[in-house]
Design a protein with these regions (language model features):
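A membrane-cytosol interface segment of integral membrane proteins
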Residues: 242-275
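Membrane-helix interface motif
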Residues: 66-78
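Membrane-interfacial helical/loop segments at transmembrane boundaries in membrane proteins
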Residues: 1-4, 77-82
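Hydrophobic core of alpha-helical transmembrane segments in multi-pass integral membrane proteins
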Residues: 19-29
Length: 275
């Protein structure tokens, strides 16, 4: 465990970029070989839009990274945060508790709030407009949402009292998890269900991308599935019934044109339909 801590304490930016690219490339190949759905779409054009948004997220996160670093350093120096108040324990348990709490505050909580607060939903719905969810969809976030999520990540680091090595570890796991859960891949049903008791599985997250309520407002988890089960936001829908997108933006010109996607948060919002 000490070696892992040492690695993430000094992980180069090049390694983080390599993990991002390698993950997308790996799942891209797998979903071509074993697709969950056979989409009739221009895969490269679709990927281009999502990769553009991924790049804007990377730029925003790198530009604001010093805030995250300063927050973590302050928490450690001032013995502030949940982890700093816990008694001595094994490093493995310390890391697990920290990752769970970062996942709760920096991912699950912000995701739920984005669905409940109309102003934040304006930005987050861009992620849901994708009717061809694949591994490139994982970081399909409007730049405005990237700033919102960064703010909650910083809040999570402060409340948890997380050292930076743990933040980098969480972000690395999160990247791979996001690519995995969005990938258009087929897993054996029993395996997917088994995984969903511990982590967010592909089919579990695909339910969240169903185009209509109440399924859109379920399965908010990022890495760990415990939060959806604990807070009653877990839902199941057979994959055969899943239709991707958001019911108010199902037309191709709505969800497959970059210019329009960037403008949607500032346009008059359309009322959702409830089944």
């Amino acid at each position: 465990m000490n070696e892992i801590v040492s690695y993430f304490s000094t992980i180069p930016s090049s390694h983080r970029s390599l993990i991002l690219v390698a993950g997308i490339s790996f799942f891209w190949l797998i979903e071509n070989a074993f697709p969950l759905f056979n989409f009739n779409y221009k895969k490269w054009q679709h990927a281009g839009i999502n990769i553009f948004m991924t790049l804007t997220t990377i730029i925003i996160n790198f530009s604001l990274a010093f805030i995250l670093l300063k927050t973590s350093d302050w928490a450690i120096a001032n013995n502030f945060g949940v982890l700093q108040w816990l008694p001595q324990m094994s490093l493995w348990l310390y890391a697990l508790i920290g990752l769970l709490l970062l996942d709760l505050i920096g991912a699950y909580l912000v995701h739920l709030i984005e669905h409940k607060v109309k102003f934040l939903w304006r930005f987050h719905l861009i992620h849901h407009t994708d009717t061809w969810v694949d591994t490139t969809s994982g970081n399909r976030h409007h730049p405005g949402e990237s700033v919102i999520r960064f703010a909650f990540t910083t809040l999570g680091v402060l409340i948890v009292g997380s050292p930076m090595w743990m933040v980098f570890m969480y972000q690395t796991i999160s990247i791979v998890s996001t690519q995995f859960t969005h990938a258009n891949i087929t897993l054996p049903k029993r395996l997917d269900i088994f995984l969903s008791y511990f982590i967010v599985s592909p089919n579990m997250h695909k339910v969240h991308h169903h185009f209509m309520l109440p399924y859109t407002d379920s399965n908010y988890g990022n890495i760990f599935s415990v939060w959806d089960r604990l807070f009653g936001t877990f839902m199941y829908l057979p994959k055969e019934k899943i239709v991707y997108g958001i019911d108010t933006y199902m037309e191709t010109q709505d969800h497959n044109q970059l210019n329009n996607l960037l403008k949607i948060p500032f346009q008059k919002q359309r009322s959702p339909k409830n089944n």
